[in-house]
């Protein structure tokens, strides 16, 4: 009997350790900026990958240690495509990103650095929830941990991007939803005219009783109420896409995943029905057994020119690569069986028809 209990405990611990995720790198216009999840990087990273479950916690702003600046700030311009890269442990091809049971929405907020770090001025600039039987997290896993936004046409200055996952596998009980977030340090070098609105406070934007936080993914439903404020209508006013800049002085770290991917890509087959088994060990924050991400090499700061999308001998664009968008000058005809899907005005992508 003791042996049986021991095996069950080990299985639960292993399952629990494979549940969680952090943002470990970003890409700018398809160029890998290298690992940023360290004190010498550009992401204000927590000490481990544990989620937050108390929506009133001060750590909801930028996660644990999120008030502490890190060494680097990445230069970006209006119209740049920013891709966030999430992982469970590290950036290796074998990493499982986040447990597939952790279905839920993904959102991105933006705030001026000083104001945002104090928990104020957060403006939602992107969100993805539930559509056609798939959750944003399903698409994130299929896309090897990547989802993208476009930099709005805001005034020049220092800003924080705050990508966030809400895992709802225990959202059927009050206080069970799990929140994962980090803050990425950027400096907008273009000088746009669309100043951010007043925004919301985080903590403060969510309540444990919000329909999109206290939500049962295992019962029948046809839609999902996104939590928090609406997406800012100025988020789509991103100005002109940037011209290529000089290559980085250091060779960027390149992963096996494609370099130009948006959030809604390469879907996996999922349903709203309950899975055969769910995590039984995800509860209060202090109870998690987690793994601290392995140290990564320091990041580069200057983006390089975007590589053209791979093409067939006929000149058509392969699946998952860019086929259009504002200021895009490459091939626009997708391979047979694919269509050019517009995700936003700056990024169109070849996907299966």
Swiss-Prot record:
Residue positions binding Cu(2+): 20, 102, 180
Binding residue positions for O2: 169
CBM1 domain span: 315-351
Biological-process GO terms, alphabetical: cellulose catabolic process
Catalytic reaction(s) noted: [(1->4)-beta-D-glucosyl]n+m + reduced acceptor + O2 = 4-dehydro-beta-D-glucosyl-[(1->4)-beta-D-glucosyl]n-1 + [(1->4)-beta-D-glucosyl]m + acceptor + H2O
Residue segments, region Disordered: 266-316
Disulfide-bonded cysteines: 62-183
Cleaved signal peptide residues: 1-19
UniProt-annotated location(s): Secreted
Listed Low complexity bias regions: 266-276, 291-304
Glycosylation sites: 327
Family per similarity comment: Belongs to the polysaccharide monooxygenase AA9 family.
Comment field on protein domains: Has a modular structure: an endo-beta-1,4-glucanase catalytic module at the N-terminus, a linker rich in serines and threonines, and a C-terminal carbohydrate-binding module (CBM). The CBM domain is essential for binding to and subsequent oxidative degradation of polysaccharide substrate.
Record protein name field: AA9 family lytic polysaccharide monooxygenase A
């Amino acid at each position: 009997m003791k042996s049986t209990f021991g095996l069950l405990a080990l299985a639960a611990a292993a399952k629990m350790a494979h549940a969680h995720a952090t943002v470990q790198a970003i890409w700018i216009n398809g160029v890998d900026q290298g690992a940023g999840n360290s004190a010498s990087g550009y992401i204000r990273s927590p000490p481990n990958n544990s989620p937050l479950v108390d929506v009133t916690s001060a750590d909801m702003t930028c996660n644990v240690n999120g008030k502490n600046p890190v060494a680097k700030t990445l230069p970006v311009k209006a119209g740049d495509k920013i891709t966030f890269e999430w992982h469970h442990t590290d950036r290796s091809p074998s990493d499982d990103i986040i447990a597939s049971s952790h279905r839920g929405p993904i959102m991105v907020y933006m705030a001026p650095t000083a104001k945002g770090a104090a928990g104020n001025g957060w403006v939602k600039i992107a969100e993805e929830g539930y559509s056609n039987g798939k959750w944003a997290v399903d698409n994130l896993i299929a896309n090897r941990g990547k989802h993208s936004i476009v930099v709005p046409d805001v005034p020049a200055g220092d800003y924080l991007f705050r990508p966030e996952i809400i895992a709802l596998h225990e959202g059927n009980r009050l206080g069970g939803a799990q929140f994962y977030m980090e803050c990425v340090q950027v400096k907008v070098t273009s000088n746009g005219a669309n100043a951010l609105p007043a925004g919301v406070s985080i903590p403060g934007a969510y309540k444990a009783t919000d329909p999109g936080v206290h939500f049962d993914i295992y019962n029948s439903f046809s839609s999902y109420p996104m939590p928090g404020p609406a997406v800012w209508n100025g988020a789509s006013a991103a100005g002109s896409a940037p011209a290529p800049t000089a290559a980085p002085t250091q060779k960027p770290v390149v992963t096996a995943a494609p370099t130009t991917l948006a959030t809604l890509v390469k879907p996996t087959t999922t349903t709203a029905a309950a899975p055969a088994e769910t995590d039984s060990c995800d509860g209060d924050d202090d109870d998690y057994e987690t793994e601290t991400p392995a140290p990564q090499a320091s990041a580069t700061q200057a983006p390089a020119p975007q590589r053209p999308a791979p093409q067939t001998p006929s000149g058509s664009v392969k699946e998952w690569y860019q086929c259009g968008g504002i200021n895009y000058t490459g091939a626009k005809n997708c391979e047979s069986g694919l269509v050019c899907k517009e995700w936003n005005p700056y990024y169109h992508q070849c996907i299966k028809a």
